[in-house]
């Protein structure tokens, strides 16, 4: 706050505390090592979506996944789950998972700050499609982005979803990697 934003005593900043509520705060003390703020005004409205959206996607090549994580955060996604699929090109080695998740969490935090979100999306990694299914059984709606669905001229599934009231509902959207989703995975998911 002091170095990057060049904020001084009595300047106002937005702070989101653990209660996920945004406050306008006064800086009452600052130095290089710490900043002390005092809540000044509670910001009542939230810019979070009323629908809890989870996106599940296999890891992509490094620069693509980082860009995608940033944009998903800016769009208002609530959870992001990375999973191994049959066709994903980018594989994460078991000993690298924690360091990658830590780096990607930092990207999510920065994107949430930049887009003035009240929360930082959660990021998790599951090792298989079956694990993904097991961890998302409680979702209200499940959507799979499948390239061959465009052959279905009516797209009834998507039309039905978009007609529903999605407020206070949860949706998981599953996407394939650069190689797409295999026929076997589609049969498991549908």
Which residue ranges define each predicted feature?
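Short amphipathic alpha-helical segments
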Residues: 69, 94, 156-157, 185-188
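Residues in the short beta-alpha loop(s) of Rossmann-like NAD(P)-binding domains
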Residues: 19, 86, 148
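Short, intrinsically disordered, charge-balanced linker/junction segments flanking boundaries
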Residues: 3, 187-190
């Amino acid at each position: 706050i002091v170095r990057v934003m060049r904020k001084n005593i009595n300047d106002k900043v937005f702070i989101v505390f653990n209660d996920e509520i945004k406050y306008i705060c006064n800086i009452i003390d600052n130095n290089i090592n710490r900043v002390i703020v005092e809540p000044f005004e509670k910001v009542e409205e939230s810019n979070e979506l009323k629908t809890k959206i989870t996106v599940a996607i296999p890891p992509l090549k490094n620069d693509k996944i980082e860009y995608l994580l940033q944009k998903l955060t800016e769009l208002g996604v609530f959870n992001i789950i990375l999973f191994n699929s049959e066709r994903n090109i980018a594989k994460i080695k078991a000993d690298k998972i924690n360091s990658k998740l830590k780096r990607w969490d930092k990207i999510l935090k920065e994107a949430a700050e930049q887009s003035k979100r009240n929360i930082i999306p959660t990021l998790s990694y599951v090792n298989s499609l079956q694990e993904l299914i097991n961890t998302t059984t409680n979702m209200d709606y499940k959507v799979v982005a499948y390239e061959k669905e465009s052959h279905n001229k009516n797209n009834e599934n998507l039309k039905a979803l978009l007609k529903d009231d999605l407020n206070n509902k949860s949706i998981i959207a599953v996407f394939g990697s650069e190689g797409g989703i295999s026929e076997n995975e589609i049969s498991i998911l549908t």
